[in-house]
From Swiss-Prot:
ATP binds at residues 12-20. One of its GO terms (biological process) is pyrimidine nucleotide metabolic process. Its EC number is 2.7.4.25. SUPFAM superfamilies: P-loop containing nucleoside triphosphate hydrolases. Pfam families: Cytidylate_kin2. The gene is cmk. InterPro entries: Cyt_kin_arch, Cytidylate_kinase_dom, P-loop_NTPase. Coiled coil: none annotated. GO terms for molecular function: ATP binding; CMP kinase activity; dCMP kinase activity. Keywords: ATP-binding, Cytoplasm, Kinase, Nucleotide-binding, Transferase. This is Cytidylate kinase.
Length: 193
């Protein structure tokens, strides 16, 4: 792992494996794990709402999104932190490594169904509706298209690897991270000089 202060963001849609990866990174490297989804779930519980109800409530109360974003940005000021959230890569612009995890929706629905003890069909409908609402909300609130992956340094389809495989890929990326932030520039300087 490069020496110094690392800030890593991990983003992805429901069931893509972001929480598992972040827990593994936090355990292996001793990183602090900041989880926007947990903040969101806690706020829903505090208000006595289901996630679906709270999702609709948040659409009418953008200050909730802004508070979650503020907490992520504040957390990025710390050293050796992994920040998990759908918009973490967008919010933490100066992150050393921005990761997006993805998988086909049916694969994600199977994972969510298993995790939440519901049918795959129910999970599929919940995921599809939530993603539609989130995409609209992010576009309206921030002008961010969640489907734009151009800001990410590493994109992994987690349907191809289990948690250990995904961790191994990300670990290799972290362990070989260029301290200058631009490995291509270092190579050009060597070639020219």
């Amino acid at each position: 792992m490069p020496k110094g202060c690392l800030v890593i963001t991990v983003s992805g849609l429901a069931g893509s494996g972001t929480t598992t990866l972040c827990r593994n990174l936090a355990k292996h490297y001793g990183f602090k794990h900041i989880y926007a989804g947990l903040i969101f779930r806690q706020m829903a519980k505090e208000m006595g709402m289901t996630l679906e109800e709270f999702q609709k409530y948040v659409e009418l109360h953008p200050e909730i999104d802004r508070e979650i974003d503020r907490r992520q940005i504040e957390a990025a000021k710390e050293c050796n932190v992994v920040i998990e959230g759908r918009l973490a890569g967008w919010m933490v612009k100066n992150a050393d490594l921005k990761i997006w995890l993805d998988a086909p929706i049916m694969e994600r629905a199977k994972r969510v169904a298993k995790r939440e003890g519901i049918s795959v069909e129910e999970a599929f409908v919940k995921i599809a509706e939530r993603e539609k609402q989130n995409r609209k909300r992010y576009l309206n609130l921030y002008g961010i298209d969640i489907e734009d992956k151009s800001i990410y340094d590493l994109i992994i389809n987690t349907a191809h690897w289990g948690p250990d495989g995904v961790f191994a890929i990300v670990k290799a990326a972290i362990d070989h991270l260029s301290p200058s932030g631009d490995a291509g520039e270092d190579e050009k300087e060597k070639e020219v000089g």
